[in-house]
Structures are given as C-alpha cells and as structure tokens.
A protein has these predicted regions:
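Conserved SAM-binding strand-loop segment of SAM-dependent methyltransferases
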Residues: 56-69
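Conserved SAM-binding loop of SAM-dependent methyltransferases across substrates and taxa
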Residues: 29-42
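Conserved SAM-binding motif I beta-strand of class I
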Residues: 43-49
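S-adenosyl-L-methionine
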Residues: 1-20, 138-139
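Conserved class I S-adenosyl-L-methionine
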Residues: 19-29
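C-terminal substrate-binding/active-site "lid" region of AdoMet-derived donor-dependent transferases
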Residues: 86-139
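Short beta->alpha hinge that forms the Motif I/post-I loop of the SAM-binding pocket
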Residues: 49, 83, 107
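A short acidic, Gly/Pro-enriched loop at the edge of an enzyme's catalytic core
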Residues: 69-77
Length: 139
C-alpha cells in the first residue's frame, strides 16, 4: 500500500477547479491545506472565531454566524475541514451569498444536507456549487 499525505485529493481538486481568492472557515490550528494552496498561487484566507497564530497564512478572526461580508467577497471557494455540524448551514449561507462554491470535509459519519458527495483521488468531501462559472448541482 502506498502512503498518501492527508487531503492530497482535496488539494488537487481545488487546484484544478478554482483560482484566485479562497477562504477556509473554521480553520482551527490545522493549516496543511491552506499552506499547500498558497504555495500553488491561491490568495488564501483562514477564518476562525478564535484568534490563532498562523504560519505565513493570512488569518482573520470572524464569527461565521454573523459574518463580516467583506472577508468572503470575490472568493471562488469557501471550504471547511471538519467543522462542527451545527455550523454547516452558516458556511453554506456565506458561500451562497457570495456566489462561491462550498466544500465541506466532514468528520467521519457526518453528511451535509444538499451537498453532493465527491470522491477525488481517494479523498471524500462534499460540494455545493454556487459560482457563476458552474451550474448549481442542487437547488
């Protein structure tokens, strides 16, 4: 069996399908995906309700239940890795309001409603498309 770094498929999917500004919400202290996407030329912003020191990644403290709209404006993608289930609807609302696609990589066993399951190169995550460049997957 070949060892794969965690989130390799997710990083590759985002790299192939998005450009420009992307925002990771509920980032916590795990920045592997954000750092790799920044290396690939993305304008990455990490957001969390708690102030966190980040390793060379732009970080903005924000409460996604009452978000500051300017943080998310013009993002092509809003994504979150293992956010609390009760925040899914708020993440989705931010993405829809900003016409950005939304990806959630949930904890094992959690399934976001109104999202499509993706299996990309062995990584499983859920997507909902809102961007002007893509048709909506689900209403």
């Amino acid at each position: 069996m070949v060892y794969r770094e965690p989130f390799t498929g997710l990083i590759e999917y985002i790299s192939r399908n998005y450009s420009g500004k992307i925002v990771e919400v509920c980032s916590g202290k795990m920045f592997r995906v954000a750092i790799e996407l920044k290396k690939r030329g993305f304008d990455v912003i990490c957001v969390d309700v708690k102030a966190i020191d980040t390793p060379d990644i732009r970080f903005i403290q924000d409460d996604i239940i009452n978000p500051k709209d300017e943080i998310y404006r013009n993002a092509s993608l809003i994504y979150s890795i293992r956010p609390p289930y009760e925040l899914y609807k708020h993440i989705l609302k931010i993405a829809e309001k900003n016409n950005a696609d939304c990806i959630i990589k949930p904890f094992y066993g959690e399934i976001p409603e109104d999202f499509r399951l993706m299996n990309y190169r062995g990584d499983h995550f859920y997507i909902r498309k809102f961007s002007k460049n893509h048709p909506k997957i689900l209403k």
